[in-house]
């Protein structure tokens, strides 16, 4: 179902319904998000003295938070599906009460020193023991409160997804407020106590929302669907897979981009705050009936950003960290905007709201698992970053709309893929033979200039440039664009480039690389952006 299938009713609700009801649910959702995203930097900063400042600390932490969010959404979906709305609140309030036993937040005894080796699982266990229950209780609120609001019978409940934008706005404020306001003003212990107070306030607000729900006439989401006059069509499995994929790619890109900038661009405290803030901001911008940025403009900006980013990664000699950072921010932000807007356009009727968020969260978890746990074992360098940049082209509307019955289009895609793979193999071979091929006498200065161009930029950059021209010419064919973007990724990781330099080994603590110096006289050892010697 597209965005035209479910018409938001927020303006009508404001006119004909009670502003107080909207305000109560919005404020509760906002407070829940504040707590949800303030506990993440709070506890991670407590863990840093134990595990150090490796990029993997935040990557694994993000993986845990995505997994716990999935558990919370699963709990909310089961609660909404199997417990009547007027009784579900009692169950949720009991869970919140049990979570109080884990407060205030602190490092549990017996978890002060990780075991030898890569402490991936140990860190996940630490987070589960210390903040698992409170995080589960808070994470369930976003879909649960939206489902409750839809069940109140309020006119705005016909499309309660606007509450999700309020939730992400609260998350964004918490995330930015922690490093710049809260942490400099209060210590970790005081912040943990304040978080406990905020949790109690949230429990009271949830109770108010629940009692308000019990006092309303509407008791089910199916009634809300009927009142809206929209058929509550059950989502198909292809639609569910689409939800997962559209959530997976930007989620994995969030972790991959954070790892990339902290490994290959610059290392700085709290560097992860910017990508996560931008990720949350994308929901605020596009998870609404009328996105703040038109989709046509988003698609154009995204296409340009992906091309520029992959071209930059293909160069063995690229610009400084400022240019790399700005390019990375632009491509990550536009990619997440496009994926999340497409996700919003595919949202279901309110009856399937909690299921929608469950699949969305599953995609987030799978993306986090891939980028945080699988990719470091699979790749010797941060190859997942250019891979995910290419995959964002598959998140554009119509990118996967290729029918097996359309033999002509399938043939074109096969020809593009086969030609691209042949070019990836033969072009470097031919360019390597250029100085001794005798072409200098035939072409004169042209061959010499081409040779200098290859020596300066490398085969990967030249091939990526050629693929990018083909990609831009295919602007009316999203499936072809997605395939060509994958060819650009292969050029970046198969040939010497900005992410493939020398010999590398990767571990929990980063990427160790041995490569030639810029003048070619020495072999140098680097760990991320740190030079350890020659």
Indicate residue ranges for each PLM-predicted region.
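Alpha-helical transmembrane segments of multi-pass membrane proteins
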Residues: 2-534
């Amino acid at each position: 179902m597209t965005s035209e299938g479910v018409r938001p009713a927020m303006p009508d609700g404001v006119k004909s319904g009670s502003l107080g009801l909207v305000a109560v649910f919005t404020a509760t959702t906002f407070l829940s998000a504040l707590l949800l995203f303030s506990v993440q930097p709070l506890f991670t900063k407590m863990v840093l003295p134990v595990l150090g400042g490796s990029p993997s600390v935040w990557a694994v932490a993000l993986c845990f938070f995505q997994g716990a969010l999935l558990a919370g959404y699963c709990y909310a979906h089961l609660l909404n599906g199997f417990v009547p709305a007027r009784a579900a609140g009692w169950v949720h309030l009991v869970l919140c009460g049990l979570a109080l036993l884990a407060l205030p937040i602190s490092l549990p005894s017996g978890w002060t020193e990780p075991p030898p080796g890569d402490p991936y699982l140990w860190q996940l266990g630490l987070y589960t023991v210390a903040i698992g229950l409170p995080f589960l209780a808070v994470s369930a609120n976003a879909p649960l409160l939206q489902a409750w609001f839809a069940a109140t019978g309020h006119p705005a409940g016909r499309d309660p997804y606007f509450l999700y934008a309020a939730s992400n706005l609260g998350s964004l404020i918490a995330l930015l407020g922690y490093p710049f306001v809260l942490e400099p003003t209060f210590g970790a212990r005081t912040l943990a106590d304040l978080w406990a107070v905020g949790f109690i306030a949230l429990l009271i607000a949830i109770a108010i929302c629940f009692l308000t729900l019990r006092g309303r006439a509407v008791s089910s989401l199916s009634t809300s669907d009927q009142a809206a006059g929209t058929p509550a069509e059950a989502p198909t499995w292809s639609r569910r897979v689409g939800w997962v994929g559209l959530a997976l790619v930007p989620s994995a890109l969030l972790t991959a981009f954070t790892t990339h900038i902290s490994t290959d661009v610059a290392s700085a405290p709290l560097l992860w705050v910017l990508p996560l803030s931008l990720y949350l901001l994308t929901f605020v911008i596009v998870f609404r009936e009328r996105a703040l940025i038109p989709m046509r403009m988003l698609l154009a900006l995204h296409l340009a950003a992906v091309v520029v980013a992959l071209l930059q990664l293909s160069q063995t000699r690229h610009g400084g960290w400022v240019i790399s950072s700005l390019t990375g921010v632009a491509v990550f932000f536009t990619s997440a905007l496009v994926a999340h807007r497409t996700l919003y356009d595919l949202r279901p009727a309110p009856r399937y709201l909690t299921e929608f968020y469950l699949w969305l969260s599953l995609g987030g978890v799978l993306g986090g698992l891939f980028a945080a746990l699988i990719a470091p074992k699979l790749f010797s360098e941060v190859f997942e970053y250019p891979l995910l940049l290419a995959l964002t082209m598959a998140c554009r509307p119509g990118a996967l709309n290729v029918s097996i019955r359309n033999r002509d289009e399938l043939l074109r895609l096969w020809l593009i893929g086969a030609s691209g793979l042949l070019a990836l193999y033969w072009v470097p071979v031919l360019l390597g033979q250029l100085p001794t091929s005798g072409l200098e006498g035939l072409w004169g200065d042209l061959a010499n200039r081409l040779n200098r161009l290859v020596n300066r930029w490398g085969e990967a950059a030249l091939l990526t440039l050629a693929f990018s021209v083909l990609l831009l010419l295919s602007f009316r064919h999203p499936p072809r664009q997605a395939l060509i973007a994958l060819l650009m990724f292969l050029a970046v990781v198969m040939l010497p480039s900005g992410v493939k330099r020398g010999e590398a080994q990767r571990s929990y603590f980063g990427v160790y690389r041995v490569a030639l110096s810029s003048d070619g006289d020495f072999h140098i050892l680097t760990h991320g952006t740190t030079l350890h010697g020659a």
